[in-house]
Amino acid sequence: MKWLSRILTVIVTMSMACGALIFNRRHQLKAKTLNFNHKALTIIIPARNEEKRIGHLLHSIIQQQVPVDVIVMNDGSTDETARVARSYGATVVDVVDDTDGKWYGKSHACYQGVTHACTNRIAFVDADVTFLRKDAVETLINQYQLQGEKGLLSVQPYHITKRFYEGFSAIFNLMTVVGMNVFSTLDDGRTNQHAFGPVTLTNKEDYYATGGHKSANRHIIEGFALGSAYTSQSLPVTVYEGFPFVAFRMYQEGFQSLQEGWTKHLSTGAGGTKPKIMTAIVLWLFGSIASILGLCLSLKYRQMSVRKMVALYLSYTTQFIYLHRRVGQFSNLLMVCHPLLFMFFTKIFIQSWKQTHRYGVVEWKGRQYSISKEQ
């Protein structure tokens, strides 16, 4: 069995080498104090049955050091979303129904929201997002100014978890970030064409010039289409990590919601990662199974060194935790038991593949969307 021990050691070592390459380029926001004596921007929040989440976002907006307008686009909510939003002083606008079925996801609400914005700068923020610091919006504006107040800026919020099951989102969140290509030196450095969806900042002129969310009207995950629309007009598209300014808490409704959400995400958003980066990601993830396999076999066969296999497992686990700490706050127990996370990721991946290629339909928040129509 010594030969198997050597093979597994080589596999895990190669896996960790790939892990060192998939997220070795950082894109972090830089804080700076700005002075505004007028409304700095309009924040547009698409919301459908978000009464349990939107209050946290609106409270964090009130705490910001710069004055902003807030528009909540109420997309057919059947709960108290509108009442909660008004209690924080937000303007609530009901989304006009899409009777023709031409729009998917939140793009319809976002596009209508721009017509109500009174500032040139506009930001689209998901209802489950929270600004962690009082200078968060200020920092976003500063970063946008650094790119000449042109194009599109997007942020992937830091993922905060409170209940154990929420930690099963760990690998998905890391893949969302590294799958954007630009966080790896394996990227060829060409113009970025993709954007994160939870937080985006742009200006009206560029928004309408590119078609804005109209270019993503058939997309459930709108970030890729939005980024491509801006790139096609030779406008800059930038992506940033949220910590320590922006965070979100996902799928508070329960484990079923988490499964449905990531199935939707993988069904519609897994095609933008470049092949060599995707290969490195797959090889890195495979190290999770290889390391636990070596550990289990060493406990059964004396020819394999338990000490070496434990060291191998702990080495991979250390890197696994290190990379995930950049994108979120997850259960230490789940981080150590990463093979469970890998198996869950694989299960959802297979499920999303079936929905995409066999059924062609994905369901989210009580609505069904045909993936086959999505371009």
Swiss-Prot record:
The keyword Cell membrane applies. It is a multi-pass membrane protein. GO terms for biological process: carotenoid biosynthetic process; protein N-linked glycosylation. Its EC number is 2.4.1.-. The keyword Glycosyltransferase applies. Keywords: Carotenoid biosynthesis, Cell membrane, Glycosyltransferase, Membrane, Transferase, Transmembrane, Transmembrane helix. Pathway: Carotenoid biosynthesis; staphyloxanthin biosynthesis; staphyloxanthin from farnesyl diphosphate: step 4/5. Catalyzes the glycosylation of 4,4'-diaponeurosporenoate, i.e. the esterification of glucose at the C1'' position with the carboxyl group of 4,4'-diaponeurosporenic acid, to form glycosyl-4,4'-diaponeurosporenoate. This is a step in the biosynthesis of staphyloxanthin, an orange pigment present in most staphylococci strains. This is 4,4'-diaponeurosporenoate glycosyltransferase. It comes from Staphylococcus aureus (strain NCTC 8325 / PS 47). The gene is crtQ.
